[in-house]
Structure formats: structure tokens, C-alpha cells
From Swiss-Prot:
Pfam family, one: Ribosomal_S6
Keywords, ordered alphabetically: Ribonucleoprotein, Ribosomal protein, RNA-binding, rRNA-binding
Source organism, top-level taxon: Bacteria
InterPro entries reported in the protein's UniProt record: Ribosomal_bS6 (IPR000529), Ribosomal_bS6_sf (IPR035980), Ribosomal_S6_plastid/chlpt (IPR020814), Transl_elong_EF1B/ribsomal_bS6 (IPR014717)
Keyword Disulfide bond carried by entry: no
GO molecular function (one): rRNA binding
Keyword Ribonucleoprotein: yes
Organism of derivation: Ureaplasma urealyticum serovar 10 (strain ATCC 33699 / Western)
Gene Ontology biological process terms in this record: translation
Protein's name according to its UniProt entry: Small ribosomal subunit protein bS6
């Protein structure tokens, strides 16, 4: 069985009963599926206006099915319905982000990459501290010798 996630964005100018009715009508097309999770995320501000609307109701459904025609029917009805502003259907088994959290090899590879990144960051910080200490020592040496000390301004001495 393939795992899917659907996010549905319904017009915000409807009252909650009407929005729930729209979402439930579309969800009814997903009969013969095993619904894992059914989230109503409430009225939310949109990042940008869609059809001159600034708010919308968001619904998220997670389910498993083997029948792709149900997904196609849901997509068709969501496009036809004028109260649905946006929808997205994600096959979680083909989604690389999902695979990276489930596949043991990819998890191990990502952990190694994270370790390398942390080591590189620590090495860069250590080198920066060494450069700062060398600069402070040079500055103290020049002051002790009575020579003028040029203040170090980050980026001022670099060639462009």
C-alpha cells in the first residue's frame, strides 16, 4: 500500500461548517483507504492573497491506498470545486525527504555528513581563534617595541 498525504486549503470566507462540508465531501472520495491521520489546522493567514482572500482553512490527511484512481478522482474534484483554493497530494514513499528518514543507509549517511559538518565548523572556529591570538601577540610585540600598531579591520586588508 502506498502512503499519501493531502493538504487541502479551503476558502476562508466560508463559515466553519461549510468549510468542513467541502473537506468532508472531498474526503468521501477516498473510500476504501486506511486513514492514518486527519488534521484540521484551523483558519490561517495566507502568505499571499489567493483570489483576493487572506485567510483559509487547512486540512491535512494521511492515508494508505493501493487504488490510484481514488487519488486522481480526488484531484479532479478538488480542481472543479470553487471553494478549494489549493491542494497538494504527496506520495510519501516517493518523497525524498520521507525516504531520508526511513531508509537506514540514508539516515547513516546523513549522520556522517552532520558529523563532518560539525568537525569542519569546530576546525574553522579553532583557526579563527589562533589567528586572533597571533594578531594579539603581534600587536603586543609592536607596542612593546614602540612601533605603530595598525588596527585590524575585518575585510579591509583583503584584495578584491
Amino acid at each position: 500500500m502506498a502512503k499519501y498525504e493531502i493538504m487541502l486549503v479551503v476558502r476562508g470566507d466560508l463559515d466553519q461548517e461549510q468549510a468542513n462540508k467541502v473537506a468532508n465531501e472531498l474526503k468521501a472520495t477516498l473510500k476504501n483507504t486506511e486513514v492514518k491521520e486527519n488534521n484540521y489546522e484551523g483558519v490561517q493567514q495566507l502568505a499571499y492573497e489567493i483570489n483576493k482572500l487572506k485567510t483559509a482553512y487547512r486540512y491535512v490527511y494521511n492515508f494508505e491506498t493501493t487504488d490510484v484512481s481514488l487519488i486522481n478522482e480526488f484531484r479532479r474534484l478538488a480542481i472543479i470545486n470553487k471553494n478549494v483554493l489549493r491542494h497538494i497530494i504527496i506520495n510519501l514513499e516517493k518523497d525524498y525527504g520521507y525516504k531520508a528518514t526511513v531508509n537506514a543507509k540514508k539516515v547513516q549517511r546523513n549522520e556522517k555528513r552532520a558529523e563532518v559538518y560539525v568537525r569542519q565548523k569546530e576546525e574553522a572556529e579553532r583557526r579563527a581563534a589562533e589567528r586572533q591570538a597571533a594578531y594579539e601577540a603581534m600587536k603586543a610585540e609592536r607596542e612593546a617595541a614602540g612601533l605603530p600598531v595598525k588596527e585590524f579591520v575585518k575585510g579591509a586588508n583583503s584584495k578584491r
